Amino acid sequence: MASPRTVSVAETIDEYLARADWRVNANANQGYSLGGMILNAAGKLIANYWLDEVYAPEAGTAHREGDLHIHDLDVFAGYCAGWSLRMVLEQGFNGVPGKIASAPPKHFSSALGQLVNFLGTLQNEWAGAQAFSSFDTYLAPFVRLDALTYPQVRQAMQEFVFNLNVPSRWGTQTPFTNLTFDWVCPDDLADQHPLIGGEVQPFTYGDLADEMALINRAFIDVLTEGDQDGRAFTFPIPTYNITKDFDWHGPHTDALFAMTAKYGLPYFQNFVNSDLDPHMIRSMCCRLQLDLTELLKRGNGLFGSAEQTGSIGVVTINCARIGFVHSADEDAALARLDELLEIARDSLVAKRATIARHHDGGLFPYTQRYLGTIDNHFSTIGVNGINEYVRNLTRGADDITTEAGMALAARLLDHVRARMVEFQEETGHLFNLEATPAEGTTYRFAKEDIARLPGIRHAGTDDNPYYTNSSQLPVGYTADPFLAMALQEPLQQKYTGGTVLHLYMGEAMPSAEACRELVRRSLSRFRLPYITVTPTFSICPAHGYRSGHHEQCPDCGAACEVWTRVMGYFRPIESFNIGKKGEAQERTYFSTATPGDPGDSSGSGDSTDSGDSVREEAPWHGSPQPVS
């Protein structure tokens, strides 16, 4: 069918050149550049193709009017993917006709080089994050075979990290990459023998603890040093699996938490005190039959995916608008939610069919080579502005921090989960519920609603409006991280896609020990799937790294870049979109001197303490237990 819509060539180019469209800065990873202009212009054509030629009219209308947001419309591809690192290392980077073929690597440096090429190439066949799991476990055999010293491992790792941060992706973007580190060899790999260069090795992965430690230490040291100006490396985003046998006081743990205290780069995946299963990272590619009556977890957080799985596409629901339009009528609100969920389902089914058809037709040659099928990829539905949903539904009487407000939020999330089970049974596809990062969507929804619905409650100002992400707390609510965790614990557990609680700090943590204790206590006392520690820091052109928010260098007065996390990854605040800048201005930072801090008399307990005293030190409005 022919589309009646046209895209003005002159307006498209002129808007970009003049930076007249807020979407020029919607993505903090994409700077103003020729490549950005090409992507922006092409993206408008592709977006209109999706909306007019692929999706049903009601989906196009719902997106254009801001009832929901269909992500990545500017890219004719799936969303994110986790790859089998073991497959790449055992088979090499090859298999696409007419393209250069690399045999399986035999050495550490060549293995890292192939991984850079792999991630950069596959990024061009997907819209979002590309991920590898068990990075330290699978690369350890190469360190053993090459008999590498620490300086040699560090040099190779430095080259790897710098190469991954080159803006080589379309749109002059850096490839969006995630690496998950085991730290301790997983039980299901411990007795397996690596295959290197086509030869089975006499040792097992479980024999390589020393080599894993070298890899982890080298990677951490490279990230801690930063680039030549002291900037943090935005990618790869490291995720660390914290299991019950994690050595909190091991020889390299201080370095891990010193890096976290300074730059806050890692995600910590909670295998200590959550319903996450360490083996799920490798299980999806082996499950021939999936139980569609249960909601599976994708694994590895917002920007990581377990091996051979990921997400075909993401649709986020504008919950704030639902609350306003159906004020004081929860039943009507949930009925409207159902309508939007069904539109989201149908659009994701249409996208999966389209991507699968062109996958089989060769449009994504490297994905076809290394993935084979997209059957194990999820269809992802997210929520945005649940705090504003509560505020509008209750006409300002409650928000997500009150007991009644949390109950409303929990019922909404449970309702979505129940519908997703139905969707799985109806379609035969995997669905998951994600706390979508919604970097630009939070602003787009609020901007649209202010224009259409006078009086709607939102965060920020009318000039810099936004909605609170997913079911997160208002950004200015509290400086107590333990209070925030207690309030978020029951809601964060309801997500089966990515979710994370970012502990935003106004400056670096005072020490590696303080950072370690914060992470240890957080993961042992709360059933949160993922957390980050997110300090704010500044970069002076002359003096480099400076802890805290400094628009001018305290030493020389030069203008500084101020860096913090924008929904998952670190970028300068100046590169944020309008809504995210408004959010950053309103944020209350968590205190670096928290209850149970090592400097506090309560900080001497071990990891088996109950943590009840910590929860009780800051009174709050709701119950920390899950709301049924």
Q: Predicted regions span which residues?
A:
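Hydrophobic/aromatic-rich, well-ordered segments within soluble, folded domains that form packed cores
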Residues: 177, 181, 375-396, 553-584
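Conserved catalytic cores of very large enzyme subunits
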Residues: 2-375, 396, 402-555, 559-562
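Intrinsic, low-complexity terminal and presequence regions
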Residues: 536-555, 561-628
